[in-house]
Amino acid sequence: MEQNNRIWWKEAVVYQIYPRSFKDSNGDGIGDLCGIISCLDYIKSLGVDVIWLNPIYASPNDDNGYDISDYRAIMKEFGTMEDFDLLLREVHARNLKLILDLVVNHTSDEHPWFQEARKSRKNPYYTYYHWWPVEQETPPLRPSYFEESAWTYDPHTRAWYLHYFSRKQPDLNWENREVREAVYDMMRFWFDKGIDGFRMDSIPLIAKDPAFPPIDRKKYPDLFSSYAHGPHLHEYLHEMNREVLSKYDIMTVGEGSAVTYKEVEKFVGPERQELDMLYGFGPSEVRNYTTADCPDSGIGYSLIALKKMFSGWDKAVGKGWPAIYLGNHDQPRMLSRFGDDRPQFRVYAAKMLATFLLTMRGTPYWLAGDEIGMCNPKFDRIGDYRDIATLNQYKQIEKRKGDTQWFLQMQQQTSRDNARTPFQWDNSGQPECPGSE
């Protein structure tokens, strides 16, 4: 490769930090920005190039920061904007780069836009979100990822609002040009500060079919496939690239929920001018959790299926560039999922998985803690969990008088909280963050 054609993010290793669980600097039991600053030399010593932070914006924390109430402010538990500016300077001083999460499928219901929107149908912010007025009778069936229905009734406007996730995460209306311009302006704010890119959360979901055809969870169990790739999705991403992304030397990676082999190149093909990378959900689909699914080896996965998945994704990306991962904040720990976390095999399995990630074509993504072989915690009480998806699903099973013990056993393998426990800075067996739960 010619020196002047080298693209920095193609040669990078990305280190993902879930801030709440990483390093606590003030003893309140919550990881924070100053804690991350104190660990930058350690991070640099790992040989990584890019730090990706999960959401650090102001949030009421219904979904651990993925419900944003102010895109231009820092969550108080994490610190201040001055702390962030110092973090960014210290990152760059070590020749590292910093990318943030971009969460623009939805906001928090405490965001000023939604607070204004629910005052009146005549309020200019009303059209920033998706609504179904009572005059149109009951809204079409739309299951939520976190709740039974993706519609919640608002008495102030006498209309239901749409939320694919929690009812405290109303979905933005990307058909509204003002919404898109507001998002682009916010992105410029962070790029002008000097950040080096965005990981884009749930990006295939931002475009909605305004007719809202009914979705029956029994007929369409894969809601991501049902909700992704709405009208004008690629027009929006191309517009975002033209208006914002192309103006900066940055990297972008999209969360590729429901993106198939046939569709991935539409997002990352160089001629498309949309995103740089997209990570698919293949690793989450290869792993089996029932003996019926994997009768030969019990709870496990097929090595052949794993190979086919990665080979297929690499081929489908074409002239684009793959994002390579085996775990993140939404998945169980990769060692417990794809390796063997028993003490006698843990080190060997962790090194094997690391070798796999680092020898594939593409940019590898590494979740903080994987480098020391962190495993699933295997919680056995619902009170140990903080993930809204786990908690809401448990309530639904209780309501139906289902088997909650079976559910808890499955959550030991599948819950997002498996990847969100405190970073183990020593071998004491206690959380690094004093007072943390």
Segments predicted by a language model, with ranges:
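Active-site and adjacent substrate-binding regions of carbohydrate-active enzymes
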Residues: M1-E437
